[in-house]
A protein has these predicted regions:
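Sec/Tat signal peptide C-region and signal peptidase I cleavage site
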Residues: 15-19
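Low-complexity, Gly/Ser/Thr/Pro-rich intrinsically disordered linker/tail segments
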Residues: 220-243
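Primarily a LysM-type cell-wall glycan-binding module
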Residues: 20-49
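Gly/Pro-biased beta-strand-loop elements
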Residues: 80-183, 207, 235-236
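Extracellular LysM carbohydrate-binding repeats and other cell-envelope/extracellular binding modules
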Residues: 20-27, 52-89, 214-215
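Short beta-strand-centered segments at strand-helix junctions
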Residues: 191-206
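Sec-dependent N-terminal signal peptides
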Residues: 4-12
Length: 243
């Protein structure tokens, strides 16, 4: 089932894509991409630091994200307005399904994320990073075991571990940022409340952050920002995509 993502930008300019120098409220750029042979939408999306649902919904003429037409030109939504808030630590925006890490007052790193599904909503609020772990074990919560009894009580590191290769633990009990063994779930509301990231995304963020760094989870579906004296607007409506 599709639920539509609508992104509106006015008066767009161009800047850097992944690690961005902060001069105004906008980062990245909008770009076009020509599909190559045997490429899937998740291949393209990961290469450009995007979630495939946002690319799919930005290109409504694509019928199947796994079977693409070579030579077809698609647009990539690699332009973002920064969420409102103090630019320090991590801001997780449920409104556009992205995490923003402010390395300092001049540089930001942005990552696509997946968040909690219905009845397992990712909470809003403020936290700090209380720990980091490479190749984490997953102690399965009782609430998940009740819903999915096939899980063992503890899942060892490896390809079957939903936490992936890295975990960043938050002061919100039971919530963390982690990798995944199902990267196609990034950009969706599919988790049990944790913040899911691409393997390469969590590895990069893991190396950047430290214990004690601040984290704020917000939900801003409508964002506005300035660049060069011009006001820009970005709107996300029904930003969920379910399979």
């Amino acid at each position: 089932m599709k639920k539509y993502l609508f992104i509106l930008f006015l008066f767009l300019y161009y800047s850097k894509l992944f690690s961005n120098q902060l001069e105004d409220d906008l980062i990245g750029n909008l770009s076009l991409y020509t599909i190559g042979k045997n490429e899937t939408l998740i291949d393209i999306s990961r290469r450009y630091n995007l979630a495939f649902p946002e690319v799919l919904l930005n290109n409504p003429t694509i019928d199947d994200p796994w079977i693409l037409e070579p030579g077809k030109v698609i647009s990539l939504p690699t332009r973002h307005i920064l969420p409102k808030g103090k630019r320090e630590g991590i801001i997780i925006n449920k409104g556009d399904l992205r995490a923003y890490y402010f390395k300092d007052e001049n540089t930001v790193h942005s990552f696509p994320i997946g968040i909690g599904r219905a009845n397992w909503d990712t909470p809003l609020g403020k936290a700090v990073i209380v720990g980091k772990k490479k190749n984490p074990y997953w102690t399965v919560p009782e609430s998940i075991l009740e819903e999915e009894p096939h899980w063992p009580k503890v899942v060892k590191p490896g390809p079957d571990n939903p936490l992936g290769s890295r975990a960043i633990y938050l002061s919100m009990p039971g919530y963390l940022m982690h990798g995944t063994n199902k990267p196609w779930g990034v950009g969706m509301r599919v988790s049990h409340g944790c913040i899911r990231m691409y393997p390469e995304g969590i590895e990069k963020l893991y190396d950047l952050v430290e214990e004690g760094d601040k984290v704020e989870i917000v939900e801003q579906n409508i964002k506005a920002g300035w660049q060069g004296g011009v006001l820009f607007l970005e709107v996300h409506i029904m930003h969920e995509y379910g399979l």
